[in-house]
Design a protein with these regions (language model features):
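Amphipathic alpha-helical segments of tetratricopeptide repeats
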Residues: 49, 78-79, 133-134, 162, ...
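"A position-specific structural signal for the A-helix of alpha-solenoid helical repeats
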Residues: 26, 56, 111, 139-143, ...
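Structural signature of alpha-solenoid helical repeat junctions
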Residues: 19, 49, 104, 136, ...
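Flexible helix-coil transition and linker loops at the boundaries of alpha-helical arrays
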Residues: 11-18, 83-85, 96-102, 159-162, ...
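Structural motif corresponding to the intra-repeat A-B loop/turn of tetratricopeptide repeats
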Residues: 34, 64, 119, 147, ...
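Residue-level signature for tetratricopeptide repeat
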Residues: 30, 60, 115, 143-147, ...
């Protein structure tokens, strides 16, 4: 690009990726590292009005003695919106620290925080974001909320909503209430944002979950029927809520002795609606123990002992995982007991503590099996007070556990 305007135009014409500013910055960083400051400045100029490039260029010009142009670039960088600016290079910190001493403003601290966050220093990132003070920029509060826990996170999310309402702020708010099991509040916020963003299935799925957990099963199922979830790897959430709503409704109907209605709800729970973004696996890959257990209860209520026995036998024949404890294993033991095989059932339940001594779900299932309901309730309370783990921090997620908890809560 050193051969004049045409050479520069030819050079720039070959930078065709989605984020050309990042390519220029990467090249500029190399030239700067080998002492070719003029070349680095030229490359940073190619990045246009990308704030981080302007700060780095201003820093290099300052080092070269061109303070007038350097100050002009600082002013230009300060005037630009930080929207869609996501710095991550630690090498940019030196220029930003210098800029902060020359012309301090909250955006510099925000950019620094994003860099530290991208490089796994969350404590430093939060410290910098806190130092930004009260600013009129919702993504800053969204970012800061992500680094906080509990009520402090909620406070920042609410600030973000006041400044700039968007589907992202709505999703984060609903998600906070869902994570903290404040289902009624989640439903209220979900309803509000669903009206504003009716085609957004991220919000829709969280709202549907809140409707399900507040006992509004038909509204939940109706909402899911109108939703179009984009199929993607692991897109099980929609079907999980659909299944849960039908099974929760079946549990209520069993308690009301509406056995025929319960059977209809159980049958509906076995469906895999195409619009919810996930296909049905092979039958031998589906764990139907909970559905079979509820169906057995309904059949027994209708006096069909033969069908109830067949369903309980199907539960017993299910092969459980040897590597992970599943809450549905409780149903295996209970089915054995209800079939009159008490000794085998007791042996199975007593083995859980030996095979999975640290597993809290196994401990809860043991308590339920032994009729220690108060102990089981205390364990649930401890679970609810814990901070949720990220998906990659949990080696196994038990999709039946909350449903089984509800089943035995209703039974009490």
């Amino acid at each position: 690009y050193q051969g004049g305007e045409k050479a520069m135009a030819d050079f720039k014409s070959m930078i065709r990726n989605e984020l050309p500013a990042q390519t220029y910055m990467e090249l500029a960083e190399w030239y700067e590292s080998v002492g070719c400051t003029d070349e680095a400045v030229t490359l940073l100029s190619c990045a246009g009005d990308y704030p981080i490039a302007l700060y780095r260029k201003a820093y290099l010009l300052h080092q070269s003695g061109n303070d007038a142009e350097s100050r002009s670039l600082l002013q230009r960088a300060e005037s630009l919106s930080p929207s869609m600016v996501f710095p991550f290079r630690p090498s940019s910190l030196k220029a930003l620290e210098w800029a902060k001493t020359e012309k301090p403003n909250w955006k510099i601290g925000y950019y620094e925080a994003l860099i530290w966050w991208a490089n796994q220093n969350k404590a430093k990132a939060l410290q910098l974001l806190e130092a930004c003070g009260d600013v009129d920029y919702a993504p800053l509060y969204m970012s800061r909320a992500s680094l906080k826990e509990g009520e402090a996170r909620l406070a920042d999310l609410q600030k973000a909503e006041k400044i700039g309402k968007s589907w992202r702020t709505g999703f984060a708010l609903i998600n906070w209430y869902v994570s903290n099991r404040q289902w009624q509040k989640a439903a209220e916020v979900g309803k509000r944002y669903m009206k504003a963003y009716p085609s957004n299935y991220y919000i829709g799925l969280k709202y549907a979950k809140a409707l399900c957990e507040t006992g509004q099963y038909q509204q939940c199922i109706s909402l899911l029927s109108k939703m179009q979830v984009l199929p993607n790897e692991g897109a099980y959430a929609g079907r999980a809520v659909y299944r849960g709503a039908n099974l929760y409704r079946a549990m209520e109907q069993l308690n009301q002795k509406s056995y025929k209605q319960a059977l209809k709800s159980i049958e509906a729970s076995k469906e895999w609606p195409e619009n919810l973004g996930v296909g049905k696996p092979y039958d031998n890959m589906i764990d139907s123990r909970l559905e079979n257990y509820l169906e057995a209860k309904a059949a027994a209520g209708l006096g069909d002992k033969e069908k109830a026995s067949a369903l309980l036998t199907a539960i017993v024949q299910h092969k459980s995982s040897r590597s992970n404890f599943e809450s549905a294993n409780l149903l295996n033991a209970l089915a054995l007991r209800e079939l009159g095989k008490t000794q085998e059932a007791d042996s199975m339940a007593s083995a859980w503590s030996k095979d999975f001594p640290e597993n809290r779900i196994a401990q809860w299932c043991t308590a339920i099996y032994n009729g220690e309901n108060d102990k089981a309730a205390t364990m649930l309370q401890v679970r609810d007070e814990q901070t949720d783990s990220a998906p990659w921090e949990a080696s196994f997620r038990d999709s039946n556990f909350d449903l089984i908890v509800r089943l035995f809560s209703n039974a009490r």
